[in-house]
């Protein structure tokens, strides 16, 4: 099949595009507003985009009324956020925090989650998450939108501190079998990544052009 996203002429019940770019890692983002109130929400448009210094991005769409979401606003206004990596055991709690609570309402409390203090930033961490990235806000890039009332934004941050549960480190490396991160698939589907493999790049022999004869 072939279709053009602007025309939405795929002929399927649901747009298949997000079911192709998978699995997408999920940033479980904790922030704090200017009044000291904590927010927690998952974002599946997320990735590490640079290594030195390490930079991450998450993308946020506006609410139905056009207002920017709390995680986005808090990161911009306070300059800080924490990315918690959710494991398979935490998916129900993570889904609870995806609900649309009013500003200032505690998603931590609703999901029954304990907090841990961060070291270099103010937003707390999810206590039982296997890894956390403390981040400082870098900038926001507004992205195109086909709906003038709908805002798409990419928020960039620099990772300033990393926490890893020692239990997921095996032989000096993070074990994907122990990390078991939650990933987003298409539609309403999710995956828990727990199986990986190593593959060496095989060097190709140099090409011989002509003859030395």
Feature-to-residue mapping (PLM):
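Basic, polyanion-binding surface patches
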Residues: 1-213
């Amino acid at each position: 099949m072939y279709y053009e996203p602007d025309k939405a002429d795929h002929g399927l019940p649901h747009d298949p595009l997000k079911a192709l770019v998978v699995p997408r890692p999920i940033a479980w983002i904790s922030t704090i507003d200017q009044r000291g109130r904590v927010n927690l929400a998952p974002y599946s448009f997320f990735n590490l985009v640079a290594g030195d210094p390490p930079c991450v991005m998450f993308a946020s769409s506006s609410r139905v009324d056009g207002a920017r979401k709390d995680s986005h606003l808090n990161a911009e206004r306070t300059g800080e956020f924490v990315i918690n990596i959710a494991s398979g055991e935490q998916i129900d709690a993570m889904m609870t925090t995806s609900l649309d609570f009013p500003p200032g309402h505690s998603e931590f409390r609703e999901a029954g989650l304990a907090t841990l203090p961060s070291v270099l930033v103010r937003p707390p961490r999810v206590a039982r998450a296997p890894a956390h990235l403390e981040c400082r806000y870098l900038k926001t890039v507004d992205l195109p939108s086909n709906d003038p009332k709908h805002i798409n934004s990419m928020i960039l941050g620099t990772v300033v501190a990393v926490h890893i549960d020692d239990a997921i480190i095996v032989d000096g490396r993070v074990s994907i079998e122990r990390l078991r991160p939650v990933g987003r698939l298409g539609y309403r589907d999710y995956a828990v990544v727990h199986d990986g493999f190593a593959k060496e790049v095989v060097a190709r022999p140099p090409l011989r052009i002509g003859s030395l004869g």
